[in-house]
């Protein structure tokens, strides 16, 4: 597939031919289930696939949930407006985990997405459709959202580049919220250059988002420097949960970075089990609040009932999926008066400790190298409990708790041809550093 960098230099007539080709490819690869429904486009320009939780004016937006079936967005998310300002357009809806809750893209009301590298395996989640489409050549690039690894993990499983920007770098206006203090929109692309281009296009201050950082526009693409050298921290104590092949790929990546001239520094952090506990308390608490609005009254699907209480009860029971209901219940529990101090307050204290740990490392280092997941993409049905699925996020969620930028890129393949991804984590608003390291490593691996 043509890269974003190449596509931006094409004429509108040439882009129309590319869009026709993409439509044909999607039809030919319908079994991947990466796209949802008919392929719409929001205007002229380079086509960018959009996750089904980002508003595009006049398009149905469902968050892959039955409860929002038929709801048509009345406005554009800020990132869509920015695409239009940068010679790009929204093109098609990407399948996802329902309300972005999941790590496998199996909870969608449209059916599960398959990994193009091995269709018996998950593509990762929750932006599984976005990553599968880019990996299969069904999209030039795509936009996903990352609450606890939902851009990076599917990018790692499918063999793409996924970039989660710093919290506040990209406007969340028009993103249907899952966990407001953790959510962030970002690009999934074929290579590091394209990730920088798409990040530059969608980033910037937005007065419509109160959490948007008032910072100058980015020029990460123009400033890409594969020869820049950095201090990279490694966290070997985190590897105890990883499979031998992930550990081997991690150590091999360290050797390549050292041979390139980067300085490797061994560091330690709060155990990942604290990351998991704090994350799932905070994100479910925020989700229970954010999803309270989906009640069958103002928009979306409604269950006909005899009284108001039954409208709420029947609508939410019938049209929310099992994983969404589980997280709403957990969030409501930790926010209840008897348990708020014991769980939610403690989780926020742990979050502060995690932020302090990262800050301490970034006082001495420029980046942290970590795996994207403890294993390669698992087979469908091999995850037997929600807890098992939650544990697959151990390497990604700390980044969201601290609001940091992180970039996942493929570094190798296992014996079955499955992608192994590693991530570079940066200090807040230091996207340039991780892009430079990844760009240099990408060139080194490709050579």
UniProtKB/Swiss-Prot annotation:
Listed transmembrane segments: none
The protein's annotated catalytic reaction(s) are: L-glutamyl-tRNA(Gln) + L-glutamine + ATP + H2O = L-glutaminyl-tRNA(Gln) + L-glutamate + ADP + phosphate + H(+)
GO BP annotation list: translation
Molecular functions per Gene Ontology: ATP binding; glutaminyl-tRNA synthase (glutamine-hydrolyzing) activity
Q: Could you say which EC number(s) this protein's record lists?
A: 6.3.5.7
Active-site residues are 51 (charge relay system), 126 (charge relay system), 150 (acyl-ester intermediate)
One cellular component term from this protein's GO annotations in UniProt = glutamyl-tRNA(Gln) amidotransferase complex
Name the UniProt key words of this record, in alphabetical order.
ATP-binding, Ligase, Nucleotide-binding, Protein biosynthesis
Query: One Pfam family, short name please?
Result: Amidase
**Self-association and partners:** Heterotrimer of A, B and C subunits.
- Assigned protein family: Belongs to the amidase family. GatA subfamily.
- What role does this protein play? Allows the formation of correctly charged Gln-tRNA(Gln) through the transamidation of misacylated Glu-tRNA(Gln) in organisms which lack glutaminyl-tRNA synthetase. The reaction takes place in the presence of glutamine and ATP through an activated gamma-phospho-Glu-tRNA(Gln).
Q: What is this protein called?
A: Glutamyl-tRNA(Gln) amidotransferase subunit A
Q: Which organism is it from?
A: Helicobacter hepaticus (strain ATCC 51449 / 3B1)
Gene behind the chain: gatA
């Amino acid at each position: 597939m043509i890269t974003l960098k190449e596509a931006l230099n094409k004429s509108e007539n040439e882009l129309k031919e590319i869009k026709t080709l993409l439509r044909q490819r999607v039809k030919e690869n319908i079994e991947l289930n990466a796209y949802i429904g008919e392929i719409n486009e929001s205007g002229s320009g380079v086509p960018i696939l959009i996750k089904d939780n980002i508003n595009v004016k006049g398009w149905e937006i469902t968050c892959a949930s039955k409860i929002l079936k038929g709801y048509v967005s009345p406005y554009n998310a800020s990132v869509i407006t920015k695409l239009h300002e940068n010679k790009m357009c929204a093109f098609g809806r990407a399948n996802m985990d329902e309300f972005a809750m999941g790590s496998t893209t199996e909870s969608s009301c449209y059916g599960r997405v398959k990994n193009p590298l091995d269709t018996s395996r998950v593509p990762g989640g929750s932006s599984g459709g976005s990553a599968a489409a880019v990996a299969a050549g069904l999209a030039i690039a795509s936009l996903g959202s990352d609450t606890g690894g939902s851009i990076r993990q599917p990018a790692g499983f499918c063999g793409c580049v996924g970039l989660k920007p710093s919290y506040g770098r990209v406007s969340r206006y028009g993103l249907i919220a899952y966990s407001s203090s953790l959510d962030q929109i970002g690009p999934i692309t074929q290579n590091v250059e394209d990730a920088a281009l798409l990040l530059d296009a969608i980033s910037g201050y937005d007065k419509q988002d109160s959490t948007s950082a008032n910072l100058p526009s980015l020029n990460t693409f123009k400033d890409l420097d594969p020869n820049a050298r950095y201090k990279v921290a490694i966290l070997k104590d985190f590897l105890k949960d990883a499979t031998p092949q992930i550990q081997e790929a991690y150590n091999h990546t360290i050797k390549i970075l050292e041979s390139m001239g980067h300085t490797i520094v061994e560091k330690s952090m709060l155990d990942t089990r604290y990351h998991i506990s704090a994350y799932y308390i905070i994100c479910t608490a925020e989700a229970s609040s954010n999803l309270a609005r989906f009640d069958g009254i103002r928009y979306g699907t409604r269950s006909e009932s005899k009284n108001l209480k039954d409208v709420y009860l029947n609508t939410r029971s019938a049209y929310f999926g099992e994983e969404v209901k589980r997280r709403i219940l957990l969030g409501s529990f930790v926010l209840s008066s008897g348990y708020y101090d014991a769980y939610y307050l403690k989780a926020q204290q742990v979050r502060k400790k995690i932020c302090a740990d990262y800050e301490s490392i970034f006082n001495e280092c420029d980046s942290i190298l970590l795996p994207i997941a403890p294993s390669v993409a698992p087979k469908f049905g091999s995850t037997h409990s929600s807890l098992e699925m939650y544990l697959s996020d151990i390497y990604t969620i700390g980044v969201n708790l601290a609001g940091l930028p992180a970039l996942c890129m493929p570094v190798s393949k296992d014996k079955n041809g499955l992608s192994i991804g590693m991530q570079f984590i940066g200090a807040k608003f230091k996207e340039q550093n991780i892009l430079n390291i990844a760009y240099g490593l990408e060139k080194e691996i490709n050579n």
